[in-house]
């Protein structure tokens, strides 16, 4: 029987507001067994960029990352947000290690080719070093992964945190019995974003595409669900469970 591993993805105000961050740290520290935390930080990046006079541009919930924006997200994701989480977990007895994809070459990406939209310095994950992560995990280390990767040519790349969580879970599912949990700020996927009781309890890929076409699902929820379906499709043989928790 394979060892169990929990991969948790959090973002938004969960990691960027003091009250919800404290709750996250306490809840994550209480999870028993092997675990990995993947975080976002887009709100902080947008805030810092504005303070520096850098405009943030989004298309379908995805950030356009020009050269100046890349500097901001590298500082914010790999520094401010990541180290706040790591320090908080260390204070709770969790042997957390903050990582970007460039650290120990743990996640290699390729720069997204220009199609309809030029996303700039954005990476599509090419390889996750599951053996390295498993090594760390078996030594009692808890990886805390920032949404940054690299191309192996000296360039950092902004990479969607939901994608990193899904690809990490997929890679580790070869070695562990993986549960992947996406934590949303809301109760779940909503038919009406202003009504927290309008949760869609289950959703198929076809229904998702129709909801997007109808404008029911929009913005940052689109890449979250795209990556959820991708994780299911590509990890079917190994990933035991895919959940979304508020």
Label every PLM stretch briefly.
Residues 1-240:
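Nucleotide/pyrophosphate-binding catalytic subdomain
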Residues 241-246:
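Positively charged, low-complexity/disordered segments
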């Amino acid at each position: 029987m394979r060892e169990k591993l929990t991969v948790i993805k959090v973002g938004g105000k969960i990691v960027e507001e003091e009250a919800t961050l404290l709750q996250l740290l306490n809840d994550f520290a209480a999870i028993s067994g092997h675990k990995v935390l993947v975080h976002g930080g887009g709100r902080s990046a947008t805030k810092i960029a504005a303070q520096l006079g850098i405009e943030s541009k989004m298309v379908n919930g995805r950030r356009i990352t020009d050269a100046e924006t890349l500097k901001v997200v590298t500082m914010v994701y790999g520094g401010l947000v990541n180290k706040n989480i790591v320090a908080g977990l260390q204070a709770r007895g969790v042997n957390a290690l903050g990582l970007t994809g460039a650290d120990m070459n743990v996640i290699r990406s390729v720069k997204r080719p220009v199609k309809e939209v030029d996303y700039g310095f954005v990476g599509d994950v090419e390889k996750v070093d599951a053996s390295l992560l498993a090594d760390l995990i078996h030594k009692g280390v808890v990886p805390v992964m920032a949404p940054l990767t690299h191309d192996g040519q000296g360039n950092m790349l902004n990479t969607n945190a939901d994608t990193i969580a899904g690809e990490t879970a997929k890679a580790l599912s070869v070695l562990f019995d993986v549960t992947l949990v996406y934590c949303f700020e809301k109760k779940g996927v909503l038919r009406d974003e202003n009504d927290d009781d309008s949760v869609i309890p289950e959703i198929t890929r076809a229904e998702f595409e129709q909801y997007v076409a109808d404008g029911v699902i929009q913005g940052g929820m689109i890449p979250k669900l795209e990556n959820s379906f991708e994780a299911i499709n590509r990890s079917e043989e190994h990933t035991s469970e895919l959940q979304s928790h508020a």
